[in-house]
């Protein structure tokens, strides 16, 4: 058995991130900018917004072309540290 960790993903790969936060006029723009710091090739078509049934929250699905586990970790850390973000899956 190898001591190296086996990767669960083969990079590059398409990877969807689900980002939840309270409804805010700048939510989509702000969160997209945060992700683009780590994935500059993010296209508008890769961003899908859904509103909660009560209209209080947004759920944003952002699909990036991930090039490494480190890149995904950096995106996750940036998003979870942002004040507009309640949860990232």
From Swiss-Prot:
It comes from the Bacteria. It comes from Chromobacterium violaceum (strain ATCC 12472 / DSM 30191 / JCM 1249 / CCUG 213 / NBRC 12614 / NCIMB 9131 / NCTC 9757 / MK). Gene3D superfamilies: 3.30.70.260. This is UPF0250 protein CV_3095. HAMAP family: UPF0250. Belongs to the UPF0250 family. Pfam families: DUF493.
